[in-house]
Design a protein with these regions (language model features):
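Surface-exposed, interaction-prone regions used to assemble/regulate multi-protein complexes
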Residues: 1-145
């Protein structure tokens, strides 16, 4: 039996920003760039998470496509570095290339996101905190039901 697909589109280039569902704590299986989009594919049985159960209880999986406003140079990725030194109070972030980032999906969790006009910040966790910033004009949530 084929799975049903329900697609929702959210525009970030409008005067009023949309309210996006946040797949908090959900595991990302893969991250790639295709057709000028950053694509996150989430694990199966995603409806077991509270953040999804209250929004789409019938969802089996989720694919999010972030359509880049210009090109893949619009994506900036930073990984938190451990603090070094005597007091270890400072934290720093190291810029990552996308190929380095795409290798971190073994235990990558989606934490939250922040929206602005044609701009998006996504906070992830893959053994360390990762901050992804991108210029995005629209986002598609493809729910696999």
């Amino acid at each position: 039996m084929l799975d049903k697909v329900n697609t929702e589109r959210f525009c970030l280039n409008q005067p009023q920003l949309p309210e996006l569902p946040i797949p908090h704590d959900c595991m990302i299986k893969s991250a790639l760039i295709e057709n000028n989009c950053l694509v996150f594919t989430f694990e199966d049985d995603i409806s077991g998470y509270d953040s999804i159960r209250c929004y789409k209880p019938e969802a089996k999986s989720l694919i999010i496509r972030y359509h880049l406003a210009h090109d893949k140079a619009d994506i900036r990725i930073f990984k938190r570095q451990a603090a070094h030194g005597l007091f270890r109070r400072r934290e720093s972030y190291k810029a990552l290339e996308f190929r380095e980032f795409s290798k971190l999906t073994e235990r990558m969790e989606y934490l939250t996101h922040y929206l602005a006009y044609c701009s998006l910040i996504i906070e992830l966790c893959a053994y360390d905190n990762i901050s992804l910033r991108a210029d995005v004009d629209h986002i598609e949530y493809e729910w696999i039901l």
